Structure formats: C-alpha cells, structure tokens
Amino acid sequence: MIEKMIREARSQRASDIHISEGQAVYLRIDGKLIKSDLELSDEMTRKLILSLLTKERQESIWRGEDADFALETSDGNRQRVNVFCQQGRLAAAIRLLNAKVPTLSQLHLPPVLQNLANEPRGLILVTGPTGSGKSTTLAAMVDYINHTRADHILTIEDPIEYVYEQDQAVIHQREVGKDVCSFAGALRSALREDPDVILVGEMRDYETISAAVTAAETGHLVLSTLHTTGAANTVDRIIDVCPVQAQNQIRIQLAGVLKGVVTQCLVPLIDGGRIAATEVLTGTDAVLSQIREGKTHQLGSVMQSGAAAGMHTLDYDLAKLVSRGLIEKKTALKYAQDKRELEQCIF
C-alpha cells in the first residue's frame, strides 16, 4: 500500500505526503497542499503508519516521541519519514527524495557553489526554511566533491537521505540514532577518523556549532545547514545560540573559517514546478572583517557590491528569475526581503 501511494505521489510531482488518522491524505505539489483522491479508513491509516515502524520506533511513539527515519522503496528511491501523534492519533509526513543525487547544474544553482565545493577547508552553510531544498543542495555539493577529488568524506545525518556511490572519494555515512548518538558526539569522533570533508546534517545547538567550527579550524571542509533566512541572520543566529560568555570567541572563530553562506527558497515557476532562488555570501576579507567586528547589519551592502566574488542578494536573484520569464513578478514580491530593492533590480 505505501509503495503504491508513493508511486502515485511521484507521478504527480509531489514533494511530500501527509497521512493522518481521521483525515484525508494530502500531497504537497509545487509548494501547495492538495487533497489526494486516495481514501483510507481510520483502521487502514493506522495499520499503514504502524507498518512503517520497527518495534523500537513504535515504543518511542507511545512514549510521546517522534520517529524520524529513511524509507527505501523497491524502485531504489528513498523517503524521509516522520511519524508522530496528534490528539492521540497517528500521523506521518513523508518527504520524497530522488534515488540519484542531482547535480548542481540540474538544480539550477549558481556556479559559485562549485567554487565553494572546491575549497579544501573551512565552513560552508546552506540555509533556508523547512522544505527549501537545503539537504539536496548539500548532497549535490558532496557528490561534486566525490566526482572531482580523492577525499575522505564523512557524513553525519538524521536520517541518511541520499546514499552516495563512491567515485574518486571514499565516503562513510553515519546516521544519528543508529550509528552515533548525536551530531556533536559524531563530530568529536570525526576528528580521529581522518576525514577531509565533513557533512553535518544540521547545526541544532551550541555543542554541535562549536564542534563544527573547531573541525573547520583544524583543516577540514565542513558543510552544514541551518533553518535561517538571509546570510546576516545566519551569522547572528550562530552567535546568539552560544552562551553569552562564548559569543565573542565564536564570532572570531567564524571570521577565521567561514567560506560561504547560501540561503535558498523554492519559488513556483510560471510553467509549473519550482526553482531555487538563492542568496550567496562568500568569505571575502570585507565579509570576514564585518563579522569579526560585529557589523553583520552591513553584510547586505557587501553582498550588493560583491558580484565579482560570486555574491548576490535574494532579491537580485528573484529579479533575475522574473527578467528571464521563469517566475511572475507577484511571486518574486511574495518572497522578497526588500520589495523596493527587488523593483530596482528587475531589468
């Protein structure tokens, strides 16, 4: 039943499936929730969701915890599944992933991301709201490294979303809750495992942030995600998560290791589907100086004048998509950070 449901959702270009006892099945298509034609009784829904869970995961659900895991179907595709309870009833959110990691060009991402992936060391962050494609962008960067240089790549994920086929690189993928207890613990262990590149699925807390920055300081290329919008907000968020007594130190450390921040959101195309609109901040001397001095409010101006270093604001990228006839102006205005800047950028 679940495989049939997933196949049908994929045929409709859905990105997510929502299943809940007592409710209809919903699909997210091009960012919008659409009611599915599939009808399930409460009993069928409950059995379907329970069939996805191991005994241990069922026990965690009854303890009031969520279950977050990957599901591979017979066609080789993977799905990220989150099962939870609401009002005493079971529910599941299923994110549909591709079996094959897309390339940076297939994702229509700017060439500067390839330049960032070529960095031998430092910290690269991909940020944006939930469902904005952060994990897919990181996977494309990791796979680019896999096909271009003989590095040892270590990923720490919760759960593992894409499984890489080794090419030039040696790749080890560790899953939180299965192979390791936590992101921070896995990062500390990683420094003894001779990696060149470390992918951290998400920097959720101070301990993980501190360990990731330390790994970048010690000569590794660290890639991770944050649920933030805008490059300046990302830097501020990292610092704000830290204890007050550690904030100045983390600011100095960031200024020493940050190579780039990529913020993205998925916007609807005129002809259907969605495309990533991006904001890119690269670790130039001017950027790192502003971070070191606590002047993150000036990073927007640096990005506006930093095209030669691959930088651009989200509003500039949205304006470019409008000018190319890919998205409507009203769509761009909906996602814009500064509507006046967007109007000025449309050409």
Predicted segment positions?
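Short, flexible helix-loop junctions that flank or precede catalytic/ligand sites
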Residues: 1-347
